[in-house]
Amino acid sequence: MILIVDDQKDTGTALERLLRYAGHEAVSVTGGAEALTMLHIRKPSLLVLDVNMPEMDGLTVLRTIKEHDELKDVRVAMYSADTNPETETEARRLGAVDFLVKGTVGFDKLVARLCELAGEPEKLSAA
């Protein structure tokens, strides 16, 4: 299962649908606290995490995950419109496996990359 966390519900839902279309189980939530609750119920193969969110930003969520022994092995890819190099550096220092900037890659390549990071190859051919 790939868990998507984005405060922009349309973005999370669109990515969830694309991943499902590619043959993967995907769930989207709109906040960091909700994501942490979900992580304690079921650990995903990949957490796709936005940076700029109200209440609890993505870096705080990532830091919290890595501080908990039962969650620290969850793979996290940041997916954000934030282009500040310091944000990416901090995310990687905290343990993010990738930092993808929204709008810089097509959805087909994005889905392929997320599936690769999750260790789940796409189940539909590109034909």
Model-derived features: where do they sit?
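Active-site residues of response regulator receiver
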Residues: D6, D50, S80
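Two-component/phosphorelay signaling modules centered on CheY-like receiver
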Residues: K9-V27
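Helix N-cap/capping motif at the beta->alpha junctions
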Residues: S28-T37, G58
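Short amphipathic alpha-helix used as the core "switch/output" element in two-component signaling
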Residues: T37, L59-K72
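Active-site beta3 strand of CheY-like receiver
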Residues: R42-V48
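Receiver (REC) domain active-site loop signature in two-component systems and cognate sites
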Residues: M53
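As written
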Residues: G58, E67, E90-D98
